[in-house]
Amino acid sequence: MVKAQNAVSIATDLSVLRSLSEGQRFTAIGQTVQAQYHFTPKEAGYAWVSYYSPGKYKNTLTATAKDPLTTPAAMNYMASSELRFRQISLGWKHYFKGAYDSEDPFNIYGTAGFGLLFSKVQNTHSQAIDTAVYIKPMQSVAGSDDFRRLTFDLALGTELKLGAGIYFYTELRTWLPASSNPAPHLFDKYTPQVAMLNGGIRILFD
């Protein structure tokens, strides 16, 4: 008897991302492209690439005078920021209900993995502050920066069978920071803190 080969799926989706980080709340639109290798009917490994449109947000910051006799003693200014995410992730997929090739109309699954987040942030300040006279906050430094962070990636999803080997899926995802690398251009050092709603198509090659 010849043993059947394990199956492969290719999937793509549209994603709405909401950043929940303090001082960095924004919404962005993105896409994920992924491959899945099905080891058993309920277990699979995945690899995905995702990218998002820039998210924009603003914060009012205060620079304080070094000398208490300076007038004014403090100056407020606006930091306008743009933050963009790209990510690759490797992980595991488990079906709680159904299977990758289930004939049932409805599947439920979860995923867990580790990712590498590539981010670019750019900050513009509403006015120039003389740093010889005033002390500026450490966060949201003017200029741009690229940074990387490890993430712990979780998702809960459902699938609806549309036809032979074609499934429509929806997922709730999140990325949690798995490494600490303070970036002075960010307002929140615990970036990313995000929630995503994804919807797309998975095609099975059996």
What positions do the PLM features span?
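Gram-negative (and chloroplast) outer-membrane scaffold detector with strong preference
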Residues: Y37-T131, N198-D206
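Cleavable N-terminal export/targeting peptides
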Residues: M1-A7, D206
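Residues on the lipid-exposed face of transmembrane beta-strands in outer-membrane beta-barrel proteins
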Residues: T12, V16, V33-Y37, L90-H94, ...
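Flexible, solvent-exposed coil segments and beta strand-coil junctions
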Residues: S9-V16, A65-A74, D130-M138, L176-P182
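Predominantly the C-terminal beta-signal and adjacent terminal strand-loop region
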Residues: G55-T60, N76, L154-D206
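Extracellular loop and loop/strand-boundary signature of outer-membrane beta-barrel proteins
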Residues: L17-S21, A73-S80, K97, M138-S144, ...
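Sequence/structural signature of outer-membrane beta-barrel proteins
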Residues: S15-S21, P54-K56, K97-A99, L117-V121, ...
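Residues that define the transmembrane beta-barrel architecture of outer-membrane proteins
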Residues: V8, T27-Q31, E82-I88, F106, ...
